[in-house]
Amino acid sequence: VPVLAGLGTLAAMAGAHPASAADLRLIDFAERLVSPEQIKAAGFDGALVYVSELRPGATFDFKPVTREFTDALRANGLHVVSCYQYGKPGWPTPSDFTRGYNGGVADAQTALRLHGAAGGPETAPIFFSVDEGIDLGTWKSAALQWFRGLNSVLGVERTGVYGSNRTCAWAGGDGVIGHSTTPGFRWAWQTKAWSGGEREPTAVLFQTEVVTDTDPGALIDGVHVDVDDVLAADFGQWDLPR
């Protein structure tokens, strides 16, 4: 993984052309926590942190994120972005988007509580995961209802999505995710998974390396992590006033 040549300042990010944001890279956690000092030393600019509970049977140490950890990220000059995922395909707790409107209400309430407890500002978005390759029928019949439940608690403008290029596009088209302050961008975090090499042009983040059984992702001090390219000056980071 290329090492970045230093951290962008908030002032530079806020005033930069969106193209310049491509020099920033974040990580998100797939195995276990990496210390803020290690993240910074590896040349990354921040992390996506989980404002969700640990699902039964999982042993991750990064859910939910703690105030101590986010304070340490910020003390090291690193950006923080909130995301949410509880269930997962193949687990007793299925994908969150299958929980319908009422499930969306409950998940947003949990996310909001944990985001606040970790020090997250009231203006920052939270990205909610659709962690599988769904089709349009599943989006319309299930995921869309869940997102509307999320919206009822958070408001559209604080709701974001993680998923394939198509999932991100559907969420934007149906008006259930908010807008970055960078013109032309939405709260969409696209993963390369299930995207077939296609890109969603409104996405503020692109998950370019994903830890799987066949792909180790990036290594920081022996820990495998996912890697995310920043595509817009406002990518949902806590430290940007909105």
Language-model features, listed with the residues they occupy:
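Post-signal peptide N-terminal regions of Sec-secreted extracellular proteins
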Residues: 20-23, 41, 71, 75, ...
